[in-house]
Amino acid sequence: DAQGVAHELSCIIAERLGWAEMETDVTWAGRTHDAFEWSPGVDCRISAAHNEESLNHDLRAIEGQRHVLLLGMTQKHDLQSTLAPFANTSNFVRAVVTEAHGGRNPSVPPQELARELAELGYVEVEISPDPTMAMDRAVRLAGEFDCGVYVTGSIYLVGELLGEFVRREGLDLWSALTIHPLGARTEG
């Protein structure tokens, strides 16, 4: 699984850099199906999956769990193929589509994502171009349907939502993401 791979990779990097070995859980935001508490009582999971292979993998990992889908993506060479994994799942009670800002490619317009999901059989698709407002809407829907929220489609979308979460909670993003603070002793 992704968390095991991330842990192995961090151990290899630590060894090569001469860091003392330490037992720790590895969290890679957007890659390890991390839950984050955007709203108390609603399970919100984030995934940076953005291509057919990674979406297939991640959708298999949540098979049998009900969610509201929050989807935002940057432009793809073949959007239909990228979204194909969503045709093979019944996990989602609703979908909210939004924009994903950042990177070298522009966002897929939410109207286009909504059209593509409709062609895959999604009846209830809402459009909310602002990612924060889209997440708030997805959380409200999840409360109505007593299920979770699954955010996917872009590392930029994940980053934007994590940034907003940090801002809302008054957290320090730099501290939260720092593994080895400057000046920290890393050798035994």
Regions found by a protein language model. Name each.
Residues 39, 100-104, 170-188:
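Short, flexible loop segments at boundaries between secondary-structure elements
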Residues 62, 90, 142, 165-169:
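Active-site catalytic pocket residues across diverse enzymes, especially alpha/beta-hydrolases
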Residues 154:
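Active-site-proximal loop/hinge segments that shape catalytic or ion-binding/gating pockets
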